[in-house]
């Protein structure tokens, strides 16, 4: 959520920054709401002053034996009380309308974010590794994976399109990837592993920015026997739960940064992705991801963003996968982000790079929604900055390992870093 004081003092500048990311901020509507709010507040203050003045007169009038005048004054106070209740209701209505609107407004882009309308204007930062040249006809991950235990028909039979069953060697490799990622982030990068719920309420999703704007992208669930039919949601990412662990908290500054990680399934309806990536694991309704979250001092958040990108890169380097880092332009950033780097891994069968990690600094945007603060060195409570990043998407990493490390006979070489997690197995072979 944006800072309302910043909006009030720099409305035009905020509107201009939002326009950079394609959001049309209605300044006329904001000004009208502000006028309503100010008008009600002025009226409230006038009524309170009048009530206080008249209340002081009542005692004096009674002392002077002017009972009729005292009663008239008491009647005035009673009417003012009614008027104040109405003014409070009017102010509450304006505030609720303003708050609801603020919840739908995206974050302001950082000044270093390149301008652009969509993904075609993202800026490449660096490429790492050289895509392998194959001396045989390459297969995609579907053709490689199905003989090794990747079962798309089984997933469709159980749950419909965009679900997958894994068994045997593929299931083991998928698990090994997640364990390797978690261990790397814990043991090398200093994150604390978490296990968090996969079902959350709307307040939690509002805190990280998925609600109210992106309800159609979520899977809704209701509890059996719940007569009120309270709606809960399957998490679209562990960013939601990890970040919200500090909701409503005041963290001592010496405890910052907090570095949190979790391996979880992610559930997404992919409402706007009909017809995209219909083959294989690239776009699923359910997929696993290892998430990184950092809760940091505001002055250190952009250093933390670079660090987090490096943590995701270390996984790709260890798995011997070519990749590139891009900076998302203003028109392609996520709702809560002030700046985002995407890591894209080389997918040989598609002859292109595909997103495998997204690392974002949300500055105080999520913290304001969650009321997540820290106590600074002067004893003042301030909003923290929150960052999140994929470290990595497990299914897409599986795709990259299968395709980049394939052999002509359909076998898959296991990267050395993964072999301890595979019981020493060095190659997946069709049996």
Swiss-Prot record:
Catalyses which reaction(s): tRNA(Ser) + L-serine + ATP = L-seryl-tRNA(Ser) + AMP + diphosphate + H(+); tRNA(Sec) + L-serine + ATP = L-seryl-tRNA(Sec) + AMP + diphosphate + H(+)
Binding residues for ATP: 268-270, 355-358
Keyword match Calcium: no
Entry-linked Pfam families: Seryl_tRNA_N, tRNA-synt_2b
GO BP terms, alphabetized: selenocysteine biosynthetic process; seryl-tRNA aminoacylation
Pathway: Aminoacyl-tRNA biosynthesis; selenocysteinyl-tRNA(Sec) biosynthesis; L-seryl-tRNA(Sec) from L-serine and tRNA(Sec): step 1/1
Alphabetical list of Gene3D superfamilies matching this protein: Bira Bifunctional Protein, Domain 2, Serine-tRNA synthetase, tRNA binding domain
Class of the enzyme per the UniProt entry, highest EC level: ligase
UniProt domain comment: Consists of two distinct domains, a catalytic core and a N-terminal extension that is involved in tRNA binding.
Quaternary structure annotation from Swiss-Prot or TrEMBL: Homodimer. The tRNA molecule binds across the dimer.
Protein name per its UniProtKB record: Serine--tRNA ligase
Lineage of source species: Bacteria, Pseudomonadati, Pseudomonadota, Betaproteobacteria, Neisseriales
